[in-house]
Amino acid sequence: MSLKGKSAIITGGSRGIGRAIAIMLAKEGVDVAFTYVKSSIEAENLKSEIEKQGVQSLALQIDVRDFDKTKELVEKTKLAFGQLDILVNNAGITKDMALMFMTKDDWQSVIDTNLNGLFNVTRNAIVTFLKQKSGNIVNITSISGITGMARQTNYASSKAGIIGFTKSLAKETAAYNIRVNAVAPGFIETDMVSSLKEEYKNELKKVIPLGRFGTAEEVANTTRFLLSDESNFITGQTIVVDGGLSIR
């Protein structure tokens, strides 16, 4: 898929979808820098897994809500790999509850991580992409940002914002050979879904036309396609990976 020799930043890369994307890109010959927040053990395990593919890896414990730290992320990646070609904005959190019980902090913390964090990283990376007149960005959003979900006003708002951000930045940077797209997963077999009650998971599967949850690797496959030359004429789009759940 013509990715060999490129370098990437993946935020929220140490587990779930981010981890799957990191490993898949490494297998394509991409040097991978990724961020994590808590588990240094998970981060070191992923770093080792990436390096087994014969590429370089950089694990950085960074809070994407901190603008200056995300600037350091870009600088350290370029220093380690000599270049930056790809950005995957995957870092995100949830604090699901009915709006009437949601505190200002419950709202703000989700917006700060999911949307403001994405701005911070992209704002610092875009300078490099504009100077070199090339770059590829994939933002991980959610079907919650497309269809809305009960008890997710904070999360859905942040993810809908990512879709608007993606479209606007794609229009803004297309003339500089920069592509910006988004991937919107549905229910994927990650820690977030695994924590749901079994009876609720069974009910969810009944309303998914393909009858199952997706895998992190399936989301990674879509991301890899959008980062490859095979999607060179695609920008500003949101690709849904949800087993048909959002079909209307």
Where are these predicted regions, by residue range?
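Conserved glycine-rich Rossmann-like NAD(P)H-binding loop of the short-chain dehydrogenase/reductase
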Residues: 28-45
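Residue(s) in the substrate-gating loop at a strand-loop-helix junction
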Residues: 142
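Alpha-helical segment proximal to the catalytic Tyr-Lys
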Residues: 127, 171-175, 232
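Conserved glycine-rich cofactor-binding loop
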Residues: 7, 14-16
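Active-site helix of classical SDR
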Residues: 122, 158, 166
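Short C-terminal tail/terminal secondary-structure segment
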Residues: 147-150, 206-207, 224, 235-248
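Substrate-binding pocket helix/loop in short-chain dehydrogenase/reductase
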Residues: 98-99, 106-111, 193, 204
